[in-house]
Amino acid sequence: MQNMINEALIILEALGVPTSDLTNRRRIKMAKAFMSVAGLKPGMRWTQIKDNDDEHRLLSRQIITHMNTYWGEDISSGSYDDIRRKDLALPVEALVILNSAKNPNANTNDGTRGFAINPAAAKVIRKYGDAGWQQSVQEFHRERPTLASTLSRVRNLARVPVQIN
């Protein structure tokens, strides 16, 4: 199980999800949520992930159930909002996971919103461990900047001198 969690973190980082500033626990939960959205169970291969094109979309509570059942968590079903706000926030911002995949126009607090792996990211994820992995990661980044680079970008703001009397 730990090996798959480590691989999930490698994949997320390669796809531009920043993880270095997260606690180890937050990184592990993000990896488990990511694998749950992908429909992975221990022992499965990355080639077996499911994405939005497969119509595999999970609600927050379904993600919790999957994490509890297959990834050794003990998360209350009442913690569904934490999944969205904490565990899936960065992968969603990085466009690795699509939120509201079931209904793109759903409100943020709509209980019917489903999460799914972005098909563009799924093409890359399925190549993890193969010879074409690095090339597919590079192709993925040609189409979009990484979230990590976007968040770390230096802002050049015009500054106005202020004098306090």
Where are these regions (language model features)?
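Short amphipathic alpha-helical interaction segments
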Residues: I28-K29, H56-R61, D74-S100
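Intrinsic-disorder-associated interaction segments
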Residues: M1-I5, R26, H56, R126-D130, ...
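Long, low-complexity, charged/polar intrinsically disordered regions in eukaryotic proteins
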Residues: M1-G43
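A short, highly charged nucleic-acid-interacting micro-segment common to nuclease
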Residues: S77, Q163-N165
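Short acidic, hydrophobic short linear motifs in intrinsically disordered regions
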Residues: M44-S76
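Mixed-charge, low-complexity interaction segments
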Residues: G39-T47, D51, R85-K123
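Generic alpha-helical structural element
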Residues: T19-L22, N52, Y80
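Short, amphipathic alpha-helical interaction segments positioned at domain boundaries
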Residues: A101, A106-Q163
